[in-house]
Amino acid sequence: MRLCDRDIEAWLDEGRLAITPRPPVERINGATVDVRLGNKFRTFRGHTAAYIDLSGPKDEVSAALDRVMSDEIVLNDGEAFFLHPGELALAVTYESVTLPADLVGWLDGRSSLARLGLMVHVTAHRIDPGWQGCIVLEFYNSGKLPLALRPGMLIGALSFEPLSGPAARPYNRRQDAKYRDQQGAVASRIDKD
């Protein structure tokens, strides 16, 4: 059963759940907390690799990822990131989230943005128990027009679901946690699998 707005506020007040900066009460509604777009992005460089063999040797996968991913792009206040039709880009939430071992989070895009063709997360919308850090967004523009995305705009909503008990292996204690404490638009680390 997901937490309602009153329970989300209580978990925040008690320090069991942390969202930094803490969202104002106007952004905690029903069963979600609205989150904003941060100022860090990453794109894919066009045609710098014929393909990426995801099951290939780790060093080859790593080299291919280095060739296709841009350096992190950091926008200043007032600047826009333009996502063109058919493009995939990574971005990050403005807020950092810390979940306890007995709570899982879910990120959903905003319906108003989806109706313009913007997918906020391509597939990965679960936030593991024990997560700590900003949330990387996997943007895809399936619409017909470029979309201007500006830091600070409302981009998605988080919901939270208590587990039957604390996870034995929460994300922050796993040795193989590839994205622990991420603060930027971290590229795929599939080569670390």
Swiss-Prot record:
A GO MF label: nucleotide binding
Superkingdom in the source lineage: Bacteria
Key words of the record: Hydrolase, Nucleotide metabolism, Nucleotide-binding
Active site: E138
Catalytic activity: dCTP + H2O + H(+) = dUTP + NH4(+)
Pathway linked to the protein: Pyrimidine metabolism; dUMP biosynthesis; dUMP from dCTP (dUTP route): step 1/2
InterPro entries per UniProt: dCTP_deaminase, dUTPase-like_sf, dUTPase_trimeric
Annotated region (Disordered), positions in chain: 169-193
GO biological process, one term: dUTP biosynthetic process
Binding positions (dCTP): R110, S111, S112, L113, A114, R115, D128, V136, L137, E138, Y171, K178, Q182
Pfam family, one: DCD
EC numbers for this chain: 3.5.4.13
Reported function: Catalyzes the deamination of dCTP to dUTP.
Assembly mode: Homotrimer.
HAMAP family: dCTP_deaminase
Family of this protein: Belongs to the dCTP deaminase family.
Name of the protein described by the UniProt record: dCTP deaminase
Organism annotation: Cronobacter sakazakii (strain ATCC BAA-894) (Enterobacter sakazakii)
Lineage: Bacteria, Pseudomonadati, Pseudomonadota, Gammaproteobacteria, Enterobacterales
